[in-house]
């Protein structure tokens, strides 16, 4: 949806700011297609390269939400109904509302831990150093608090913007001395 231009990304800026506030510097960002092999290959590459990997999107109830299956494949783990996720959705939805599509959101790779979703209840999950969260910005933002207990960062990066009203080239030398 982002690659097609139909949806504008709102998660990246929020995630980068949030990570900086807890002392974790965002190093690389990728936007990839909803294609299993691409997700598997990308996750396998990045999880070895970085302390933490965050994915957003692809864990909902529709046919093209394939992130959970792809993450399971990346970790060579079975995708199974998580009893805790099922209990959460059973408590949140009436029986008539708990459709097969919604039950898809209870399928988590074996060995993964749930990441709480205080907004719409369907949880994300964490497996090793990979955090898998919803793509809807409000839901993803809520899930970050549940992920926070698994993260350790350094000192928060502080920054401040100032308006200078002159070309960058005029102050480039001074900036390089900072």
Q: Where are the regions that the model predicts?
A:
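N-terminal small/polar loop signature for handling phosphorylated ligands or for N-terminal nucleophile
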Residues: 16-66, 72-73
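Glycine- and acidic-residue-enriched helix-capping/strand-helix junction motifs
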Residues: 2-12
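Short glycine-/aliphatic-rich beta-strand segments at the starts of folded cytosolic domains
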Residues: 152-168
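Short amphipathic alpha-helix segments
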Residues: 166-178
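Short glycine-rich or small-residue beta-strand-to-loop segments that form or flank ligand, phosphate
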Residues: 1, 52-57, 130-133
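Short glycine-rich anion-binding loops that position phosphate/pyrophosphate groups of nucleotides
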Residues: 1-2, 58-61, 137-139
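Flexible, glycine/charged-enriched surface loops at secondary-structure junctions
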Residues: 28-29, 99, 156-161
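Proline/glycine-rich low-complexity loops and linkers
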Residues: 38-41, 66-154
């Amino acid at each position: 949806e982002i690659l097609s231009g139909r949806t504008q990304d709102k998660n990246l800026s929020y995630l980068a700011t949030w990570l900086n506030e807890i002392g974790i510097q965002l190093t690389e960002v990728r936007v990839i297609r909803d294609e299993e092999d691409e997700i598997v290959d990308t996750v396998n590459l990045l999880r070895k390269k970085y302390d933490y990997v965050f994915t957003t999107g692809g864990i909902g109830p529709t046919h093209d939400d394939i992130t959970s299956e792809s993450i399971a494949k990346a970790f060579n783990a079975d995708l199974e109904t998580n009893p805790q996720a099922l209990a959460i959705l059973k408590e949140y939805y009436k029986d008539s509302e708990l459709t097969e599509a919604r039950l898809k959101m209870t399928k988590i790779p074996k060995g993964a831990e749930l990441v709480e979703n205080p907004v719409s209840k369907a949880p994300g999950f964490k497996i090793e150093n990979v955090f898998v969260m919803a793509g809807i910005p409000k839901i993803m933002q809520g899930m970050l608090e549940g992920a926070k207990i698994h993260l350790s960062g350094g000192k928060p990066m502080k920054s401040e913007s100032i308006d200078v009203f002159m070309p960058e080239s005029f102050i480039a030398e001074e900036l390089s001395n900072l």
